[in-house]
Amino acid sequence: NDLKVAEKVRGSSGIGLQRYVLAILFNQVIGEANRMLAKVHEGRYHLFRSDDKGKGNKRGLELKVHDNRCPEAQGRSVSMLSGGEKFLVSLALSIGLSTVAQRGGVQIEALFIDEGFGTLDDSSIHDAMDVLESVRRSSGMIGIISHVQLLESNIPTHLEVIKSGEGSRIRLA
């Protein structure tokens, strides 16, 4: 009897219930990430799940990016992105995951981003900060850990860690 239920759940696609549910949630995360990516680099990038028949656990969960500057291209693996592009895609996916989780009832009061901004040019930093500000207004606190000076002028309240011979101290700026 349990075997028949398992076969029904597995279905004709053979992907299994868990992977099926993951794919639905992943599509939602990708959708939210694409909403953010539409606001940076003039909407140049668009994420999508690959239809490639992957190996083992990755099957159906492989992520690719379409570059609108190359409309004839089929999309490329996110592993082929530059450092700055990877940071923006990672940021978009983090925000997308946070949004989907909150929609499901999980309360996320803070989002912390550790570095990554150093890989971006000034225009991309401004784009990312605009997106983060809109997220902050709707979702709560965002903490950014960075050495990029340009961020200091874009963040109204920040903590500065000052190193000295006796140790480090924190200054609210």
Where are these regions (language model features)?
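Terminal ABC-like ATPase head and other globular end-domains that cap long coiled-coil arms
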Residues: 1-173
